[in-house]
Amino acid sequence: MLKGKTVVLGVTGSIAAYKIANLASMLVKKHADVHVIMTENATNFINPITFETLTGNKCLVDTFDRNFQFNVEHVALAKRADVFMVAPASANIIGKIAGGIADDMLSTTIMPAKCPKIIAPAMNTGMIENPIVQDNIKKLESYGYEIVESATGYLACGDTGKGKLPDAEVLQDYILKAIAKEKDMAGVRLLVTAGPTREAIDPVRYITNHSTGKMGYAIARQAMLRGADVTLVTGKVEIEPPIFVNVVDITSAQDMYEAVMDRSTEQDVIIKAAAVADYRPAEVAEHKIKKADGDMSIKLSRTKDILLALGNQRIEKGIQDQIICGFSMETRDLIENSRKKIDSKHIDLIAANNLKVAGAGFGVDTNVLTLITRDSISELPMMSKEECADMLLDRIMEMRKAADLS
């Protein structure tokens, strides 16, 4: 994903410096060329040899290192960088950069860098809330630096509050958003649904399905990385939503219907990847239903068909600049059933999979999709859900271009 990209990580004096070793390792696994610059104080928390071992590159600390290459080292690295992240960023380095002070290897390297620059503050709550530090952060934002929001939690000083460095996975996502993909979806407003719905029987029990939300979340993440303005309408799942995505949490099919329809006319692309219940209990018991001898039956009522409502709305309101994609899970007659859905629901595309095919369906990290339109069929091999998401988004962008919507 990051092959051919140069990532520069600036590490300052903070107990959170250990997290950057994990971040560097993660980036190397994605084939990035990772270079680490440390302040003198940072070396008291983690040894430069750690970063050299993980990245295969010299860790820079001393501006006047006699073992420099012919190029002025800090300028050469600044020119090569595709993205520059300072994490953890102390109040000191934030103040230096904001004030134009360049007196060590880190500050002299970030100063001439033209690439996207990301600052991840990490410090005591009292320090990060200090008006001077806040003014410096705002100043950097005004200069185009992206600021990573500090996490809240237990701090090394014993306090609990804001100032904690986010985990390496979050920091990595900031880097990926900056450089991992071409921003071919910039300006595209995309809504995707994900996960299951829950239809209450009583205060304790509900009807649901096996959806984990992985496919919908993969679509949301890949679209975000490609620059789209993403809204994720999601049922209850066990995975964290991607950063930089507008998340709308729902529980029932009716909740999802309302959340989607309320936002639908504002979207350029709608992808309905959620596994929405087709039926719900006609009545919800006020109290827990007690166990009794014999069988029990529950009367079910049909839920609203969100995909059909979207297709009908597009016709009724004359919306001509919107692509609607549905997901279909079949066990037989996959293409025939999918084409019927395209026609009956007035949509553009179905991403279909067969639950009986190995590597497809719920609870796995792969999928086997067939992308079906009125006049084309594209069968994809088994691949990761992230790769499936990209292939689906590629197809949608092709359709937008063909319709002169891009």
Task: Name every feature range the model reports, one short phrase each.
Residues 1-118, 124-213, 217-406:
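A cross-family phosphate/adenosyl-ligand binding-site feature
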